Each structure stands twice: as C-alpha cells, then as structure tokens.
Amino acid sequence: MAPDDFIEMIGNAAGKICADYNLPASVCIAQAALESGWGEYVIGNYNYFGRKWNRLGEYLELPTKEYIDGQFVTIQDKFQSYSSLDEAIEDWCVLMTEEPAYADALAEWESTWDVEAFIRAMAPVYATDPDYADKIISTINANNLMRFDGWND
C-alpha cells in the first residue's frame, strides 16, 4: 500500500483513539507503518503493530527477526490477532498506558509532552532494533504525522 493510502486508512482512527488515551497518534501511526511495511505485511487480522501475543484472544505463530547479541536472528514467536483496526489501535494505547514496562516512557511523555523523548524512552522496550527510535522519528517527520496528534488541532 502506498504511504499516503496507509496514512488515510489509519490516521483518523488513530487520532481519535489515541486522543482518548492522551497519547501521540503520530507515534502509533509511524509504528504501524514500520511494523507492517505500510500495510503490506499485516500479521493475521489487523496486527499492523507486530504486536506479540498478550495471552488473550487469538494468535498466529510465525518466524520473526529479532536483534539479539548484536545481530539479527530469526525466531518463532506468537503474534496477536484482532477483530478490527480500532481494536488493534486501542490495544496499542492500552499497552503504552498500562504495561509496567512502558511506565518510564509514559512518565516521560506526561512530564514533557515531547514526542521524540517519548519515542526514545519507549522504543528500546518495544523493539530490539537499536535504530528503531530513529526510524519512528524519521517516519513521523517525512510524513507530517504530527498532524494527527490531538493537541495540534
């Protein structure tokens, strides 16, 4: 899917749902774009985020690349499956706001309202790729994704 088409598909839903959780939709959209290759590689149903199985609901077990001990390796892992795009976005929001592993990132966000600081605190928890934060930031900037952040209306 072309980036503009992907952004059109997810942008407004992410903007609305992320605003309900007081989170930056730009980060949500950029992560979905990166994890799914702009919608080309969706895992199961609506898993645009590459979200690992949370032990609730249905999952698919698939090979995935992870960065371990300084190199990318392929492992088998379980990935979440969703019934709708909105459910996937909401699950991302719940992950960011309720999962203890993201507490520092959430605290950084709530104290600074700095999207880049939030990304840099969140990225090492979310992904093993050491360049993940830079990739998210680049995707946001290249596609003007901050226009979907609720406080930029």
Question: Language model features by range: what are they?
Answer:
Residues M1-D153:
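Catalytic cores of secreted/periplasmic lytic hydrolases that degrade extracellular macromolecules
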